[in-house]
Regions:
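N-terminal loops that bind phosphate or other acidic moieties
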Residues: 1-232
Length: 232
């Protein structure tokens, strides 16, 4: 296990990478959300993670799990609508699994706790056309890759990203069952879910950061999200 300083550095690097990616993808996420939502998902996600990244200096002396917890707190305060408590509250809840350090085992526990809290708060299941459609296959794949297939974390995370990509693709042909999109009923069919898409973007940046800090290598011809990008 890497020392605390290295783990903190990796968490902060991941935060900055995620914030930059969501800023880059703001318009695309807005376009997706304009079709089936309030057209604010891109702005909300950019604002929340950018505010968290701006607090980097405040996090410099914290343990990694405390950094993650404080990111969650910042998201609750700065991400509008229901997304703030959904993302931020779930991150805060799951951060306790990282107390004592970030390892393959604790990262699995974090992912499972995060997924469970997202499902509990949002009431969504697979097939609801939400971020859960990306999270469930990603978390299950990551857990299996670590615990059953005995893969190194970097390879396991790469497989989880691929699983999330398939989950995002799955949201397009199904009807929304939760959130504002559900009010559209069958008119929501044919549109990719923005929450699942931003989840994939976040996971891609976690993988990119992990490649800088973990031993090993993964083959990626392109970002997984390139395969799900749609012109709305």
């Amino acid at each position: 296990m890497a020392d605390v300083d290295t783990q903190r550095e990796a968490v902060l690097a991941a935060l900055e990478n995620v914030a930059a990616r969501l800023s880059e993808e703001r318009k695309y996420l807005t376009d997706l959300d304009s079709a089936i939502g309030d057209a604010d998902h891109g702005a909300n996600m950019e604002r929340g993670f950018s505010k968290a990244a701006e607090k980097r200096d405040d996090f410099d002396e914290m343990d990694p799990h405390e950094v993650v917890k404080n990111v969650g707190t910042t998201l609750i305060s700065n991400v509008g609508g229901a997304s703030g408590p959904l993302y931020g509250g779930s991150i805060m809840f799951a951060s306790q699994e990282l107390d004592g350090g970030i390892t393959a085992e604790t990262s699995v526990a974090f992912a499972e706790a995060y997924l469970d809290k997202v499902k509990d708060r949002g009431g969504a299941q697979v097939g609801s056309k939400t971020m859960v459609d990306a999270l469930v296959p990603a978390v299950h794949t990551y857990k299996k890759s670590i615990e059953q297939d005995d893969l190194p974390p970097l390879e396991a995370l790469a497989k989880a990203v691929d699983a999330a990509k398939r989950g995002v693709q799955f949201t397009t042909p199904i009807k929304a069952m939760k959130g504002r999109a559900s009010f559209l009923d069958w008119r929501s069919v044919g549109h990719q879910d923005p929450g699942a898409t931003s989840t994939l973007f976040i996971m891609e940046e976690l993988l990119a950061t992990a490649e800088e800090y973990l031993e090993g290598d993964v083959e990626r011809d392109a970002r997984a999200s390139d395969a799900v990008r749609r012109d709305e």
